[in-house]
Design a protein with these regions (language model features):
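C-terminal tail/cap regions
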Residues: 2-4, 9-11, 247, 251-305
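Rossmann-fold NAD(P)H-dependent dehydrogenase/reductase core
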Residues: 2-220, 294-305
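Residue-level signal for the nucleotide or nucleotide-sugar donor/cofactor binding architecture
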Residues: 50, 79, 232-233, 240, ...
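Polar helix-capping/helix-linker motif
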Residues: 80, 166, 229, 247-248, ...
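Short, amphipathic alpha-helical "lid/cap" segments that border enzyme active or binding sites
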Residues: 85-88, 235-246, 281-288
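Alpha-helix initiation/capping motif
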Residues: 175, 179, 231, 276-280
């Protein structure tokens, strides 16, 4: 089916009333567009955000467009395990279901920084933070019928490599290399979690998405401005891949969704292929073991109950 507008594509997504969807980083960029779209489909949104002022401002913007929307703002700092633990406990105590967890928030090619637990910020937030969060919310997801986990990756994963000797980028830090590593980790986590969930006989779809080249912030240079006019799509378009993965029909676990246009840069979403490295089961197992050790989390104990 050839699409001409976001509105036309949106008409293919059914009403989602009765569902509760949690989105990390829902106050800006792709996460905001996810929340805005899904609120319009009747979804109860949990906006998990670090900055409450920005989150409440984003909530107001969405409610201005969708006055009947239900959006809860909860504070979550993915760079701090204590915040993740406190947030997760609050979610488990407050909600009786969780239909979709969208792990969207990301630290993108920042100057070198560390999380509270001294992990490189990108790897700590983009991978380890979401790895711990997902584990803590897994009991609620598993008791919710037809639940899904969506990990937002990036085409940058194709340039990534998991450097187990330098996961924290302490020996040498290159922002793009570190970002690619974290986005590759997102995909390895996606596929391995789906394998483990399936092996345990649990009903949960774990999928990944990427936005293509989406405009999530103003151009930072003349070159970026020129490129954005030529190739970069809007954040609203970029968010459609995640929305399809989260609530679309005929979605399969362990799949990857992104723009269907030239080189997956832009376009309406479809199933796409990740890199060969992202599909490396041995690499995924090794990263899983390292991630459990670094986060102090055991998925086996959760999946065995």
């Amino acid at each position: 089916m050839s699409m001409k507008s976001i509105e036309e594509w949106a008409s293919t997504i059914a009403d989602q009333s009765g569902k509760i969807i949690l989105i990390t980083g829902a106050n800006t960029g792709l996460g905001f567009e996810d929340a805005r779209f899904l609120a319009g489909k009747g979804t109860h949104i949990i906006m998990a955000c670090r900055d409450l002022d920005k989150a409440n401002s984003a909530k107001k913007t969405i409610l201005d467009e969708h006055p009947g929307g239900v959006l809860d703002v909860l504070q979550l700092n993915l760079a701090d395990f204590a915040s993740i633990d406190e947030f997760s406990a609050r979610v488990l105590d407050t909600y009786s279901q969780l239909d979709v967890l969208i792990n969207n928030a990301a630290a993108i090619m920042t100057p070198y920084q560390k999380t509270t637990q001294s992990f490189e910020l990108g790897f700590g937030v983009n991978h380890l933070g979401h790895f711990r969060l997902t584990a803590l919310l897994l009991p609620l997801l598993l008791k919710t019928s037809n639940a899904r986990v969506v990990n937002v990756s990036s085409s940058a994963h194709k340039f990534g490599k998991i450097d187990f000797e330098n996961l924290n980028s302490e020996k040498k830090y290159k922002p793009m290399k570190a970002y690619g590593q974290s986005k590759l980790a997102n995909l390895l986590f996606t596929y391995e979690l789906q394998r483990r969930v399936s092996t345990a006989g649990k009903q949960l779809l774990v999928v990944a998405s990427h936005p293509g080249w989406a405009k999530t912030h103003p151009p930072r240079s003349r070159l970026q401005g020129w490129m954005s006019k030529l190739m970069i799509q809007s954040a609203a378009m970029g968010a459609l891949s995640t929305i399809l993965a989260a609530v679309g029909n005929n979605i399969e676990g362990g799949k990857y969704y992104g723009p269907g246009g030239f080189m997956e840069v832009r376009g309406f979403p479809k199933e796409v292929q990740s890199s060969k490295m992202a599909r490396d089961i041995d690499l995924a197992t090794k990263l899983w073991t390292a991630s459990e050790k670094l986060t102090g989390i055991s998925y086996d104990s959760i999946l065995s109950t």
